[in-house]
């Protein structure tokens, strides 16, 4: 079965959220619970790329996010779902060549509709708009 990237992003969000609560969570088991995979079917490569990429670049992304927050705000004040959405968007903005920055931002805003609220949408749009620079080449 082929999954649309939007669905893969949602599963990546859910996986990363679970990993915040339990860093030892079994990712493969989570994928099986969140995606209707046939027994022989493999986890979509893009899902693995997102989850691994966000995890590997988390410190870099958190530093960028913190630098974009209003005076007096720290990363600890950002709600966990919003932080994960920001990290996912930053990964796509900086490391996924075939996802334009505008698309990464739009997809983050769509995810916010599903996993957060309207106030958070404005916050995420502001942070990503502030950061939205050129992509970094992948290793």
Curated annotation (Swiss-Prot):
<keyword id="KW-0889">Transcription antitermination</keyword>
<dbReference type="InterPro" id="IPR035926">
    <property type="entry name" value="NusB-like_sf"/>
</dbReference>
<protein>
    <recommendedName>
        <fullName>Transcription antitermination protein NusB</fullName>
    </recommendedName>
</protein>
<dbReference type="InterPro" id="IPR011605">
    <property type="entry name" value="NusB_fam"/>
</dbReference>
<dbReference type="GO" id="GO:0006353">
    <property type="term" value="P:DNA-templated transcription termination"/>
</dbReference>
<dbReference type="GO" id="GO:0005829">
    <property type="term" value="C:cytosol"/>
</dbReference>
<dbReference type="Pfam" id="PF01029">
    <property type="entry name" value="NusB"/>
</dbReference>
<keyword id="KW-0805">Transcription regulation</keyword>
<comment type="function">
    <text>Involved in transcription antitermination. Required for transcription of ribosomal RNA (rRNA) genes. Binds specifically to the boxA antiterminator sequence of the ribosomal RNA (rrn) operons.</text>
</comment>
<dbReference type="InterPro" id="IPR006027">
    <property type="entry name" value="NusB_RsmB_TIM44"/>
</dbReference>
<keyword id="KW-0694">RNA-binding</keyword>
<keyword id="KW-0804">Transcription</keyword>
<dbReference type="GO" id="GO:0003723">
    <property type="term" value="F:RNA binding"/>
</dbReference>
<comment type="similarity">
    <text>Belongs to the NusB family.</text>
</comment>
<dbReference type="GO" id="GO:0031564">
    <property type="term" value="P:transcription antitermination"/>
</dbReference>
């Amino acid at each position: 079965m082929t999954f649309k990237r939007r669905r893969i992003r949602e599963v990546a969000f859910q996986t990363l959220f679970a990993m915040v609560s339990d860093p030892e969570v079994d990712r493969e088991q989570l994928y099986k619970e969140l995606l209707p995979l046939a027994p022989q079917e493999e986890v979509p490569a893009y899902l693995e790329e997102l989850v691994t990429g966000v995890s590997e670049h988390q410190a870099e992304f958190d530093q960028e996010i913190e630098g974009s927050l209003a005076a007096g705000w720290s990363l600890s004040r950002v709600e966990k779902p919003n932080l994960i959405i920001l990290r996912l968007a930053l990964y796509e903005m900086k490391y996924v060549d075939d996802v334009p920055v505008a698309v990464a931002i739009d997809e983050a805003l769509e995810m916010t509709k599903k996993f957060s609220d309207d106030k958070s949408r404005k916050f995420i749009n502001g942070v990503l708009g502030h950061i939205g620079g050129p992509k970094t080449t992948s290793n």
